[in-house]
Amino acid sequence: VDFTNRMIDVFGDQQASLVPALGDFFDGFRDLALDASSRVRRDQLLSSASTVTARFRELADRLSAFDLESKEALETKVEQFNELLAQLSLVNAKLIKVQDLSKQPPDLLDLKDNLLRDLSSYAKLVVKEESNGSVVVGLGSFDRKLLEKAEFGRLDIKTSSDRGSSIQLELSY
């Protein structure tokens, strides 16, 4: 949402807007067509062409900066998610050692619940609690298990440039 609002601000900014610059540019062509020999009108057209070029460059620079910033933010979020998942796998490993839920340490169960809550702020999770209090965690559905027993998957970011800049999340074990 933050990136979207900032993009709207950039494209809505009158100083960076292409609309007036393109209008001046095409008006310059119209004016030059009326008097093709006018040196002043040629210079005005060249000036408006320079303005349009500068606006395109400025917008391209801003979009590149947004692209980089959004990728870095995504990388940070994925790393935080992976760290929480690793912590939950350690908790799960301890919970698996005790078969009876009533004999599990309450602070360990609380830690598990807190980690699940934190993880769910990053992605839609499906959680199945076992009889001993350990959990099986899926991403969106159980066909993509993130955590089972003490085994967990790690999310990785894969980028490709075959169609511009494409980002995919991959789950690996």
Feature locations, PLM:
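Phosphate-proximal small/polar/acidic motifs at interfaces that engage nucleotide phosphates
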Residues: V1, Q87-L90, I96-Y173
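Alpha-helical heptad-repeat coiled-coil segments that mediate oligomerization/polymerization in large
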Residues: V1-M7, Q14, L18, S38-L45, ...
